[in-house]
Amino acid sequence: MAAQKRKTTKRRVRKNIPSGIAHIHTTFNNTIVTITDPAGNAISWSSAGALGIKGSRKSTPFAAQLTSEAAAKGAMDNGMARVEVYVKGPGPGREAAIRSLQAAGLEITAIKDVTPVPHNGCRPPKRPRN
């Protein structure tokens, strides 16, 4: 019998990054929070779908709150204390996600809205009828 070869897997290295950038991307259907170092390398991320929230509940402010809490926890495990917040998109979870980052223990130094605004580009989707 041949000797079994052990698989070597890379361990996640705990980085000590004091400040970073929180990118909050809110759409009408989901919220994605990515926390990066100042160079733009992802430290931690989370989304409503990744947390197991399904369907129309992904687009709620509560889902955005849980998402940013999970991302903030991962960032704080890597020694992060201060973040700049970049918010992109028109979704319902914008304010909830920012409030949740602060409640999780991260100090927010600046908030920027980086939502792309078209110079009358593509035709938008039809208005939903309730």
From Swiss-Prot:
Signal peptide (UniProt feature, chain positions): none
Disulfide bonds: none
Keyword S-adenosyl-L-methionine (UniProt): no
GO cellular component labels: ribonucleoprotein complex; ribosome
Pfam families in UniProt: Ribosomal_S11
GO biological processes: translation
Record keywords, A-Z: Ribonucleoprotein, Ribosomal protein, RNA-binding, rRNA-binding
Molecular-function GO terms, alphabetical: rRNA binding; structural constituent of ribosome
Function as written in the Swiss-Prot or TrEMBL entry: Located on the platform of the 30S subunit, it bridges several disparate RNA helices of the 16S rRNA. Forms part of the Shine-Dalgarno cleft in the 70S ribosome.
Subunit annotation: Part of the 30S ribosomal subunit. Interacts with proteins S7 and S18. Binds to IF-3.
HAMAP family noted in UniProt: Ribosomal_uS11
Record-stated family: Belongs to the universal ribosomal protein uS11 family.
Name of protein: Small ribosomal subunit protein uS11
Organism in which the protein naturally occurs: Acholeplasma laidlawii (strain PG-8A)
